[in-house]
């Protein structure tokens, strides 16, 4: 089957924002105005298409990323709506990994908010081109100019308006297009009918000034255009758009648009901007992969190339079972064909291919380079794994996910629930790389760990609804970590003789702190002191032993281990012997490398009326919090601080109490830091 849409006319983009900025409402309006749906669903009514889970409908928030596709001006648009709550940041992470562009949605009253900064950093890490949509211009307190300033100050990027709102709050009724010098006045109806009129006199000077600034900024991306601009020549609309597109694709320029998704004002202009400025799959740098020899390979976005795809999400569908979401980077994948999972070196059959529209599936026969679909039938592929055909053997760059910071114990209410609970936890862990489940070796309890209380609350609720498992839930616990604070060289030797073939493994390892870099294993063996086949078992032995640290049995992180010497026995050495020797070396290091306990530190932003400012500051300090700054916004005070997660349990209730229900806060994981000695002693005592 031939390609129906040229690759140059594809747009793979996501919508990202802080919670309640209006992402899903924007997505719904895009679906409606593109003709994908014919009835507008609202998040506050639980009727939106993209928020299809029961928990999303009840809570009015997005929990899982939802994919769909629409058409606009001869272009095919793959759209992914992502969550705004920090607990579900994994959905943003894996979506941005496979998208070519994004719309960052801001609340016009709030401007840049904490989760805006988080998702912006995620997008920057993957070098995703972005346009910015200042939403809710109809909201009380909406201020476009202040929102643009917050982008420049808090995100530190070149954000330049290409639109100007006419009015704000209840008086917001039009948008000035600075590029084409046109004005659109909206009738307020759901069809978003707009009347083109001349620029009102009171805006003419401002438009002239802002357009000149826009042209000056985009001229930086084209030498000839800059020369024409400096000579005072007229710059064409086509040249301005071409240079904006160039700046956006290079992540050097971020155009700012405005509107009100809820009131159907500015959505069609936003769709025009997606087509005009966000890249197609052929506009972005070629995907990097690595061959069997470890050398870098660039993947060409071509139908004629071998098939290469990345599984970026796994979901469970009650009707068809496992859905594996895949971005196709090159080649063509057909229904009924086979793919190879490179990491697991395993072939799997593609039973069916489907294009998703939220939770609905539309079956297709094939998928081509640059597109996104879901595969039915893959049993062993998980998030972040590369799929290829038999003509190529490469692995795409891996995805990085945050580690859980909070845990709690769960137990089945009845014996009948025991097996069902194990199946449910296994399936949920397959779907969500930031959700972990394990058995506490001391108590035998089943522990679930995630990114926050809401994250775990949703997962427990899903167990009850989707898997019909009733569970008892314990109180939330902090997920502490352990690490080494001092460098030292240690030895691990395992010798076992009991008649017949014995066991022999001997390693010398240098351990040192590796702050914020995770576990790093370095092989410095020379001269065959340890045969190559035993190096990997040494690493595996260390990784297994690091699951339980020397202080209180918490997992170990941020350690560099350099294997520099050792010995072996021609007959008695084995992989198992070297695994055990490595674990003994780590145990010895626990005695000499000054182990320390690390606790998760949360970045919080508290908003309270002026009269509660002092009480709030005092309360944060009493929780071992470090105040990082305060800011006056209208008639409220915003306090930014770093506080240990251990001290934040019950904070919502306390804040509500001393602010008489008028305070609110947002919180997200910041980093791990060494725990004070007094707290360490308390924690170790509870573990004994």
From Swiss-Prot:
SUPFAM superfamilies: EF-G C-terminal domain-like, P-loop containing nucleoside triphosphate hydrolases, Ribosomal protein S5 domain 2-like, Translation proteins. GO terms for cellular component: cytoplasm. One of its GO terms (molecular function) is GTPase activity. GTP binds at residues 17-24, 81-85, 135-138. Disulfide bonds: none annotated. Keywords: Cytoplasm, Elongation factor, GTP-binding, Nucleotide-binding, Protein biosynthesis. Transmembrane segments: none annotated. InterPro entries: EFG_II, EFG_III, EFG_III/V, EFG_IV, EFG_V, EFG_V-like, EFTu-like_2, G_TR_CS. Its main location: cytoplasm. This is Elongation factor G. The keyword Cytoplasm applies. It is found in: Cytoplasm. Belongs to the TRAFAC class translation factor GTPase superfamily. Classic translation factor GTPase family. EF-G/EF-2 subfamily.
């Amino acid at each position: 089957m031939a390609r129906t849409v040229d690759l140059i006319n594809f747009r793979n983009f996501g919508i990202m924002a802080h919670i309640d900025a209006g992402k899903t409402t924007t997505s719904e309006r895009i679906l409606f105005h593109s003709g994908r749906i014919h009835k507008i669903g609202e998040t506050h009514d639980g009727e939106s298409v993209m928020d299809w889970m029961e928990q999303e409908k009840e809570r009015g928030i997005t929990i899982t990323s939802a994919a769909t596709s629409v058409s606009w001006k001869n272009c095919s648009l793959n759209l992914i709506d992502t969550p705004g709550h920090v607990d579900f940041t994994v959905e943003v992470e894996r979506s941005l990994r496979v998208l070519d562009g994004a719309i960052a949605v801001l609340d016009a009253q709030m401007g840049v908010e904490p989760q805006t900064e988080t998702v912006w950093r995620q997008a920057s890490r993957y070098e995703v081109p972005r346009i910015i949509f200042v939403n809710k211009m109809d909201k009380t307190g909406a201020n476009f100019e202040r929102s643009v300033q917050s982008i420049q100050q808090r995100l530190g990027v070149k954000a330049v308006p290409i639109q100007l709102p006419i009015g704000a709050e209840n008086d917001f009724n039009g948008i000035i297009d600075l590029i084409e010098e046109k004005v659109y006045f909206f009738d307020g109806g759901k069809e978003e009918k707009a009347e083109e009129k001349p620029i009102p006199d009171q805006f003419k000077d401002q438009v002239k000034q802002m357009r000149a600034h826009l042209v000056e900024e985009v001229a930086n991306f084209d030498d000839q255009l800059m020369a024409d601009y400096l000579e005072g020549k007229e710059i064409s609309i086509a040249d301005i758009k071409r240079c904006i597109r160039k700046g956006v694709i290079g992540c050097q320029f971020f155009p700012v648009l405005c509107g009100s998704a809820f009131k159907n004002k500015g959505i069609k202009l936003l769709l025009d901007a997606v087509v005009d400025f966000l890249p197609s799959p052929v506009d972005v740098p070629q995907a990097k992969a690595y061959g069997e020899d470890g050398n870098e390979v660039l993947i060409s976005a071509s139908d004629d190339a071998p098939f290469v795809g990345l599984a970026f999400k796994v979901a469970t569908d009650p009707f068809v079972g496992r859905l594996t979401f895949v971005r196709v980077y090159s080649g063509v994948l057909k229904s009924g064909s086979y793919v190879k999972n490179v990491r697991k070196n395993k072939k799997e059959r593609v039973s069916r291919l489907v294009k998703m529209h939220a939770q609905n599936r539309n079956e297709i026969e094939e998928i081509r380079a640059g597109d996104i679909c879901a595969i039915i039938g893959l049993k062993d592929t998980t998030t972040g794994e590369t799929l290829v055909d038999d003509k190529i053997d490469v692995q795409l760059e891996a995805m990085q996910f945050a580690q859980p910071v909070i845990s709690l114990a769960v137990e089945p209410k009845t014996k009948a629930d025991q097996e069902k609970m194990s199946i449910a936890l296994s399936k949920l862990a397959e779907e969500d790389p930031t959700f972990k489940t394990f058995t506490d070796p001391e108590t035998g309890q089943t522990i679930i760990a995630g990114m926050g209380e809401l994250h775990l609350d949703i997962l427990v609720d899903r167990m009850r609804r989707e898997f019909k498992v009733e569970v008892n839930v314990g109180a939330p616990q902090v997920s502490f970590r352990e690490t080494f604070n001092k460098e030292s060289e240690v030895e691990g030797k395992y010798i076992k003789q009991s008649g017949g073939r014995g066991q022999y493994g001997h390693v010398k390892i240098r351990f040192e702190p590796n702050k914020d870099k995770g576990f790093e294993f370095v092989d410095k063996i020379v001269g065959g002191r340890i045969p190559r086949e035993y190096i990997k078992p040494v690493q595996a032995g260390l990784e297994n032993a690091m699951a339980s640290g020397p202080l209180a049995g918490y997992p170990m992180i941020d350690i560099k281990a350099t294997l520099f010497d050792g010995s072996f026995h021609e007959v008695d050495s084995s992989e198992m012997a070297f695994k055990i020797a490595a674990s003994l070396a780590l145990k010895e290091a626990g005695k000499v490398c000054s182990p320390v306990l690390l606790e998760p530190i949360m970045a919080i932003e508290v908003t309270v009326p002026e009269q509660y400012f002092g009480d709030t500051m005092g309360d944060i300090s009493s929780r071992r919090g470090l105040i990082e700054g305060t800011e006056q916004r209208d008639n409220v005070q915003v306090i930014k601080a770093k506080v240990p997660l251990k001290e934040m349990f019950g904070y919502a209730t306390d804040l509500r109490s001393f602010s008489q229900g008028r305070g609110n806060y947002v919180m997200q994981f910041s980093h791990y830091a060494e725990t004070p000695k007094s707290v360490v002693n308390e924690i170790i005592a509870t573990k004994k």
